[in-house]
Regions:
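Acidic, polar-rich low-complexity tracts and alpha-helical solenoid repeat scaffolds
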Residues: 2, 18-309
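Bacterial N-terminal signal peptides that target proteins for export
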Residues: 1-9
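Bacterial N-terminal signal peptides
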Residues: 10-18
Length: 309
């Protein structure tokens, strides 16, 4: 996908230059076989921030300089040209390639960092798929592991924290969505509990910890409330347990009254479920007794009507 994007950018640039004039000074250099002069012009254009033209020359030179000593600097400029043009997908590939091919270069550390930074720049907002966010975190962490004394470690660490914050936003929003959909399907309340707990395992220091613990109590309470009486006692007890854990974890929370109210309602729900089940058991016993009496009466009638021999 990134190759298509990159080629499109390159072709548009060439087309624009062609329209401007077939034999401009730039075109003469581009078509020239003097690679040294072409490289010099590419660097000049880069420094002049004319990245579109510089890219065309660097693209051509990467093939001609392959295997030569000058290729190191060329590939460094090439990666940064792509970066300056906003083609972060291709740029990160080139930065990584540079760091892998020239691990002892003075620019290897910088390129390894820029590889991770390009992933960071392509990390979308929290409502979208977070594949690049995870990759950015991995790349930043790899950089820190490889260069623990680098002056860039502090910034890389901050970027990781920013990216984790985005993942936390996503996790909280997804879990809350299950809760919001509980009115349509009661099993979504249970799904909310599972999602909330899983998110806190993945992100133990999540900034939404208090809100998520509250939502866990509410989700479990509503799951129990909308269950059959035969399952309510067990499920209400889980809600009570979550409520107790909330109070222990957040003793100064502004949600304490709401949590305690849910605990009281859960306890009342258990008592009500017991009464309903007891009444059902009573009715079942009464019905069973009636059936047994009718069966006995029918048996007696059959005995009386049976003729003797």
């Amino acid at each position: 996908m990134f190759k298509i994007k990159h080629l499109t950018l390159l072709l548009l640039t060439i087309l624009t230059l062609s329209v401007a004039g077939c034999k401009s000074q730039f075109e003469k250099i581009r078509l020239s076989n003097d690679v040294a002069k072409k490289y010099q012009e590419a660097v000049r254009l880069y420094n002049a921030k004319n990245y579109s033209k510089a890219l065309i020359l660097f693209e051509d030179l990467t093939q001609k300089y392959r295997g030569r000593a000058e290729a190191e600097d060329l590939n460094y400029y090439y990666a940064y040209t792509l970066y300056r043009l906003g083609d972060y997908t291709t740029a990160r590939f080139q930065f990584k390639s540079f760091a892998d091919v020239y691990p002892t270069s003075k620019n290897a550390e910088e390129c390894r960092y820029m590889y991770a930074y390009c992933f960071y720049l392509e990390s979308p907002n929290s409502t979208l798929d977070q594949e690049n966010t995870y990759k950015a975190i991995d790349a930043m962490q790899l950089f820190i592991n490889l260069y623990p004394k680098s002056e860039r470690v502090a910034q890389a660490t901050q970027y990781i924290n920013d990216l984790r914050g985005k993942l936390e936003d996503k996790a909280y929003a997804n879990a809350k969505l299950y809760y919001d959909l509980g009115g349509y399907d009661v099993t979504n309340y249970k799904a909310a509990v599972v999602a909330l707990q899983s998110s806190q395992v993945e992100f133990p220091d999540i900034k939404y910890s208090e809100e998520m613990d509250l939502l866990t109590v509410k989700s479990q309470y509503l799951y129990a409330k909308n269950s059959f009486e035969t399952r309510q006692e067990e499920r209400y007890n889980e809600a009570i347990q979550f409520a107790n854990e909330f109070v222990e974890s957040h003793p100064e929370s502004k949600y304490l009254k709401e949590v305690n109210d849910l605990k009281v309602e859960s306890e009342a729900g258990i008592e009500n479920a017991k009464r309903v089940l007891a009444e059902i058991a009573k009715q079942n016993a009464k019905y069973k007794e009636t059936l047994e009496k009718e069966a006995k009466r029918d048996s007696t009638r059959t005995t009386i009507k049976t003729p003797t021999t």
